[in-house]
Amino acid sequence: MWYSKNWKDYELLDTSDGERLERWGDLILIRPDPQIIWKGVAKHPAWKKADGIYRRSHSGGGAWVKNNLPESWKIQYGDLGFVLRPMGFKHTGLFPEQAANWDWFSGLIRESNRPIKVLNLFAYTGGATVAAAKAGASVVHVDASKGIVAQAKENAALSGLSDAPIRYIVDDCKKFVEREIRRGNHYDGIIMDPPSYGRGPGGEVWKLEESINELITLTAQLLSDEPLFFLVNSYTTGLSPLTMSYLLELKVKARYGGEIEAGELGLKVTQTGAFLPCGASSRWYLK
């Protein structure tokens, strides 16, 4: 399991009964998590001091119960800054487990000693974007949500990257990739974090299990002659990291050689010392 030991502003304090108890900066949140199927034995005292709780409704939605929870606040991960907001579907605008991936590809970028161009697809609020840019890469950040891309720009500013070579694109990621292929553009590093489920502009249903093969096949065509890495993330339970790594084996390693790693991402629980699984990643990289 991959996890980051470098968080100071985030902490998974405890887990129990389908919920996480988390510290985000100075604020304590309780959020639902379907992976937490156990009942806690030793309850952390902060369970009774939450600033915000996300409660699911019987209709399938949910809402934040705010005690002392502001509309927004800021945290740091090393020299990276992030603005957080209580959002729909229990989210805050950041997935802290992804810091393990940020550390990994940032090291590759720094050690390459050459200009690196990165494409970040389904880039959300730009955690990976600012990590890559801070490591010295130029980045093309693509997400279909205008509001989310605006928050990514805020995170870049908080990270001291307002003038960094980051290009923000509000677009459907697959259509953008297809256009980049026609334009003949190439990238040294590719990051993709596709959603498990979605609907296209015409109302068509999009499922990751049915689309990941085509998505990787298309995007692999954008790799440069000397690529550095290709990272695929998944929060889809039915799509194992080994399945994604097999696709990277066929579409990337077969052409370039290199190494492939596959594993789960996790967060260490302070109260128990155990790890909470938080999705999976498959990594290809060229040594």
Task: Walk through the language-model features, giving the residues of each.
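S-adenosylmethionine
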Residues: 173-253
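C-terminal catalytic and target-recognition region of SAM-dependent MTase-like enzymes
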Residues: 227-287
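Non-catalytic substrate-recognition/targeting regions of SAM-dependent transferases
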Residues: 6-22, 29-96, 103
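S-adenosyl-L-methionine
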Residues: 145-191
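Conserved alpha-helix/loop element of class I SAM-dependent methyltransferases that forms part
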Residues: 96-114
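Conserved SAM-binding loop of SAM-dependent methyltransferases across substrates and taxa
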Residues: 125-137
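Conserved SAM-binding motif I beta-strand of class I
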Residues: 138-143
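Conserved class I S-adenosyl-L-methionine
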Residues: 114-124
